[in-house]
UniProtKB/Swiss-Prot annotation:
Keyword ATP-binding: yes
Its biological purpose: Part of the ABC transporter complex ThiBPQ involved in thiamine import. Responsible for energy coupling to the transport system.
Superkingdom of the source species: Bacteria
The name this protein goes by in its record: Thiamine import ATP-binding protein ThiQ
Lineage: Bacteria, Pseudomonadati, Pseudomonadota, Gammaproteobacteria, Vibrionales
Natural source organism: Vibrio parahaemolyticus serotype O3:K6 (strain RIMD 2210633)
Places the protein is found: Cell inner membrane
Gene: thiQ
Quaternary context: The complex is composed of two ATP-binding proteins (ThiQ), two transmembrane proteins (ThiP) and a solute-binding protein (ThiB).
Length: 234
């Protein structure tokens, strides 16, 4: 379980204050208007920024003083996920060893992950020779080989066309289900949330204003801000 317990952060006199609990195995879409605090929340969880007060716990253990590399998360962003001078094989391999000193079993893991996301035939190519969708598949494969129980996704597929975006979301959902991965994904697309998520967390005015099962993400929700967001998105 991931818990944000009265996590407060101030940026340019704007106060963000988050309370959120995510159960193991849930896929949670983090949604809300631009500037509401979605990426701030994700950055606090990842450890890129540190709260002024409050606690962040994973399975009961505080991680608030840990550096990003010490936290049990794999991360995937919209871009800048791959090293341009490394092959697909090595980019995936970084998920297992930062110095790429892989055992025979780990090399096999890399190949299996590439196979699962559909990039096995590109293992020896550089990222510049791949399409945008193929590059994101490689980045997803690197997440997959890491032993972390949770993925943090910050609009990783928003730049892709709708068909490819749907394909990638289905792949994330499938891989997460197979391994029991918990997913927290920022998205602006209501359709993406409903395609992949079991639950949602709606951020507005610097706080988590509403949470629930994904079927409750409708224009009939009690939150007026959420109602307006859903109507605008639809």
């Amino acid at each position: 379980m991931l818990v944000l317990d009265d996590v407060q952060y101030t940026y340019q006199r704007e106060l963000f204050r988050f309370e959120l609990s995510i159960e193991r195995g849930q896929i949670v879409s983090l949604m809300g208007p631009s500037g509401a605090g979605k990426s701030t929340l994700l950055a606090l969880v990842a450890g890129f920024i540190h709260p002024d007060q409050g606690d962040i716990r994973v399975d009961g253990e505080s991680i608030v003083r840990k550096e990003p590399y010490q936290r049990p998360f794999s991360m995937l962003f919209q871009e800048h996920n791959l090293f341009s001078h490394l092959s697909v094989r090595d980019n995936i391999g970084l998920g297992l060893h930062p110095g790429l000193k892989l055992t025979v079993d780990q090399k096999r893991q890399v190949e299996q992950a590439a196979q699962q996301v559909g990039v096995a035939e590109y293992l020896d190519r550089l990222p510049e020779h791949l399409s945008g969708g193929q590059r994101q598949r490689v980045a997803l494969a690197r997440c997959f080989v890491q032993p972390h129980p949770m993925w943090l996704l910050d609009e990783p597929f928003s730049a892709l066309d709708p068909v490819l975006r749907e394909e990638m979301l289905s792949l994330v959902k499938k891989l997460a289900a197979e391994r029991g991965i918990t997913v927290l994904m920022v998205t602006h697309h209501l359709s993406d949330a409903k395609a992949i998520a079991s639950h949602f967390a709606f951020v507005a005015n610097g706080k988590v204003e509403a949470v629930g099962e994904i079927d409750a993400l409708t224009a009939e929700h009690p939150s007026k801000t959420l109602q307006a967001f859903v109507r605008a998105a639809g």
